[in-house]
Amino acid sequence: MLEYNYNGVTLDYIGDAVIELAIREALILSGITDTGRLSAAAQKFVCAPTQSNVVEKLLPILTPEEEAAYKLGRNHRISGKPKHASVAEYSRATGMEAIFGYLHLTGNHERIRNLIQTAYSDMMEEMKDKI
């Protein structure tokens, strides 16, 4: 059960920003300094199909509260059809964003760093090889 009564849309909204900032920071720290390359790389990390794939790494290690946030985000009604993802991918991606929104709003910043590392470590390694 969630400690706070946020709705899925609210958790998705803030979680999107949390993930975006964490990815941008990680890319800069990896040595990419050109803003065009940073934007292109960040987009690959935060698009719905990618988030849908990487959240699968997180599901087995989520706490009950994180899992509740995931389900809350994943299950909220989608208005319209997502442009660059299937409805299932979009739902899983918004569920992932809800996890990070929940963690941010409850002050669990170390857990955010750990889950970002777990979710994106393979992609970060590939990115480092291209620098």
Predicted stretch roles:
Residues M1-I131:
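Double-stranded RNA-binding/processing signature
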